[in-house]
Amino acid sequence: FLPAIVGAAGKFLPKIFCAISKKC
């Protein structure tokens, strides 16, 4: 269960960080 959450966060968080910092 946890690895799935970590995997999803690993894909999702970079997109959020990219959008906030605008460093894509």
Curated annotation (Swiss-Prot):
Q: What highest taxon heads this organism's lineage?
A: Eukaryota
Q: Which UniProt keywords apply?
A: Amphibian defense peptide, Antibiotic, Antimicrobial, Disulfide bond, Secreted
One BP term from GO: defense response to bacterium
The record's annotation in Pfam families points to: Antimicrobial_1
Q: Where is this gene product found?
A: Secreted
- GO CC term, one of those recorded: extracellular region
Instruction: From the record, give the cysteines joined by S-S bonds.
Output: C18-C24
Q: What is its main location?
A: secreted
**Expression (tissue specificity):** Expressed by the skin glands.
List the InterPro entries hit by this protein, alphabetically.
Answer: Antimicrobial_frog_1 (IPR012520)
* Function noted in UniProt: Antibacterial activity against Gram-negative bacterium E.coli.
Query: Which family does the record assign?
Result: Belongs to the frog skin active peptide (FSAP) family. Brevinin subfamily.
| Name of this chain's protein | Brevinin-1Sb
